[in-house]
């Protein structure tokens, strides 16, 4: 406490040792030589079988410059305030995606690869556990 009291009456050059404080420059102020500013992409993403996510996709396009956390919070508030009529559009989109979901087929080659890998693993494990 006594030291703090003395510092008030002593000039800063004496008790600070005459050190000058360095100013910190923020990274934003540095000049970008020859770089053009990139525009944030407003791509919403693909349609899903979730009506709320379909709504957020549209909301994200309207509010392009906002951060993702703010888009999620504000979008949820707007979704809660929406009437059933307005939401129906997004429910219909979700239903149409459920119908399209059954049309997709997987490649057979991927299944074969996975099975062969599993067989190899099983063989290795079985050999390691067998007493010799």
UniProtKB/Swiss-Prot annotation:
Keywords: Chromosome, Developmental protein, Differentiation, DNA condensation, DNA-binding, Nucleosome core, Nucleus, Spermatogenesis. Its main location: nucleus. Residues 18-46, 98-115 have a biased composition (Basic residues). Residues 17-46, 96-115 are annotated as: Disordered. SUPFAM superfamilies: HMG-box. GO terms for cellular component: nucleosome; nucleus. One of its GO terms (biological process) is chromosome condensation. The keyword Nucleus applies. Protamines substitute for histones in the chromatin of sperm during the haploid phase of spermatogenesis. They compact sperm DNA into a highly condensed, stable and inactive complex. This is Protamine.
């Amino acid at each position: 406490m006594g030291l703090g009291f003395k510092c008030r009456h002593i000039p800063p050059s004496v008790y600070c040792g005459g050190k000058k404080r360095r100013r910190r420059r923020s990274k934003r102020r540095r000049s970008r030589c020859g770089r053009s500013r990139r525009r944030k992409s407003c791509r919403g993403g693909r349609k899903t079988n979730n009506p709320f996510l379909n709504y957020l996709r549209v909301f994200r396009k309207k509010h392009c410059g906002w951060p993702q956390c703010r888009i999620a919070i504000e979008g949820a508030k707007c979704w809660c305030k929406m009437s059933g009529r307005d939401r129906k559009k997004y429910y219909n989109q979700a239903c149409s995606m459920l119908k399209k979901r059954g049309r997709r087929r997987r490649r057979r080659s991927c299944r074969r690869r996975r099975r062969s890998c599993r067989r190899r693993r099983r063989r290795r494990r079985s050999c390691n556990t067998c007493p010799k």
